[in-house]
């Protein structure tokens, strides 16, 4: 969801960067100082995409998987057991990190 939102916000900027000349201040900000003579990116939108690289974006939706356990335990009062596809699972609505799967 956040990835889609960011793409919707950045795509117009990428489109504009192909057809207009960037102001000197913005190009200096994106490509470093002019004295450093940093090579300009070949692709028109590469500078904007480099600002949105995965290392710079906050991790908004961490993907937490199941902990594989031989013996399942309810870790709080809201944990509950479910049997699906021949395995037992522990789910918790208040603490999603309590999710467990029987090995």
Curated annotation (Swiss-Prot):
Gene Ontology cellular-component annotations = mitochondrial inner membrane; mitochondrial large ribosomal subunit; mitochondrion; nuclear body
**Gene Ontology MF: a single term:** structural constituent of ribosome
The cellular location(s) given in this protein's UniProt record come to: Mitochondrion
- Is Ribosomal protein set as a keyword in this record? yes
Task: Give the UniProt record's GO annotations in the biological process aspect.
Answer: mitochondrial translation; translation
Q: Which UniProt keywords apply?
A: Mitochondrion, Ribonucleoprotein, Ribosomal protein, Transit peptide
Which domain of life does this protein belong to? Eukaryota
- Among the Pfam families in the record, one is Ribosomal_L36
SUPFAM superfamilies from the UniProt entry: Ribosomal protein L36
The record ties this protein, via InterPro entries, to: Mitoribosomal_bL36m (IPR052143), Ribosomal_bL36 (IPR000473), Ribosomal_bL36_sp (IPR035977)
Instruction: Report if keyword Transport is assigned.
Output: no
Q: Say which family it is in.
A: Belongs to the bacterial ribosomal protein bL36 family.
The record's NCBIfam families line, in alphabetical order, gives:
rpmJ_bact
Summarize the subunit comment: Component of the mitochondrial large ribosomal subunit (mt-LSU). Mature mammalian 55S mitochondrial ribosomes consist of a small (28S) and a large (39S) subunit. The 28S small subunit contains a 12S ribosomal RNA (12S mt-rRNA) and 30 different proteins. The 39S large subunit contains a 16S rRNA (16S mt-rRNA), a copy of mitochondrial valine transfer RNA (mt-tRNA(Val)), which plays an integral structural role, and 52 different proteins. bL36m has a zinc binding site.
Know the name of this protein? Large ribosomal subunit protein bL36m
């Amino acid at each position: 969801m956040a990835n889609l939102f960011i793409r919707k916000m950045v795509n117009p900027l990428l489109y504009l960067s192909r057809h207009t000349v960037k102001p000197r201040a913005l190009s200096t900000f994106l490509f470093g100082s002019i004295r450093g003579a940093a090579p300009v990116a070949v692709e028109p939108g590469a500078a904007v995409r480099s600002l949105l690289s995965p290392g710079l974006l906050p991790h908004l939706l961490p993907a937490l998987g199941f902990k594989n356990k031989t013996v399942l335990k309810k870790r709080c009062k809201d944990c509950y057991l479910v049997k699906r596809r021949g395995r037992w699972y522990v789910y918790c609505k208040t603490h999603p990190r309590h999710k467990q799967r029987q090995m």
